[in-house]
UniProtKB/Swiss-Prot annotation:
GO terms for molecular function: transcription coregulator activity. Belongs to the Mediator complex subunit 9 family. Keywords: Activator, Coiled coil, Nucleus, Transcription, Transcription regulation. This is Mediator of RNA polymerase II transcription subunit 9. Component of the Mediator complex. The keyword Cell wall biogenesis/degradation does not apply. GO terms for biological process: regulation of transcription by RNA polymerase II. It comes from the Eukaryota. InterPro entries: Med9. It comes from Kluyveromyces lactis (strain ATCC 8585 / CBS 2359 / DSM 70799 / NBRC 1267 / NRRL Y-1140 / WM37). Component of the Mediator complex, a coactivator involved in the regulated transcription of nearly all RNA polymerase II-dependent genes. Mediator functions as a bridge to convey information from gene-specific regulatory proteins to the basal RNA polymerase II transcription machinery. Mediator is recruited to promoters by direct interactions with regulatory proteins and serves as a scaffold for the assembly of a functional preinitiation complex with RNA polymerase II and the general transcription factors. Residues 95-123 form a coiled coil.
């Protein structure tokens, strides 16, 4: 019984992948006054640099440090879980095809299981 409760507490590999992807999503999409979206921040930084190129506080490196930090954190998380890399490497079209294949496979397994149940009930 102790082994069963330990298994229930450990997340499955699918849950671990989902947790990694959730953490990456949170890192890359945080919205607050200090962490804005990537594109507007880059646009603003480039505009400021073009307006005042000699101002030392208008460095692209300084302006984009938060973006680089968030991307490095996401990259580290991805490197820790090869399955997560596979998940994010497919295009939406590839995922649609993959989902269709899995649905067909599941239907076949369901039909096979139903036939097995029927044959067991006959005995």
């Amino acid at each position: 019984m102790t082994g069963d409760t330990e298994k229930e507490q450990e997340p499955s590999s699918g849950e671990q992948q989902l947790n990694v992807l959730k953490r990456i999503h949170e890192i890359l999409t945080k919205h607050s006054s200090t962490q804005t979206e990537f594109i507007p921040l880059l646009y603003h930084s480039l505009k400021q640099i073009s307006k005042h190129p000699n101002n030392s506080s208008n460095s692209l490196d300084a302006a984009t440090s938060s973006i680089r930090h968030r991307l490095k954190t996401a990259k580290t998380l991805l490197q820790q879980d090869p399955a997560a890399i596979e998940l994010v490497s497919k295009t939406p079209e590839q995922w649609q095809l993959h989902i269709q294949e899995k649905k067909i496979e599941l239907e076949k397994k369901t039909k096979h299981l139903q036939r097995l149940r029927e044959s067991i009930q006959k005995q």
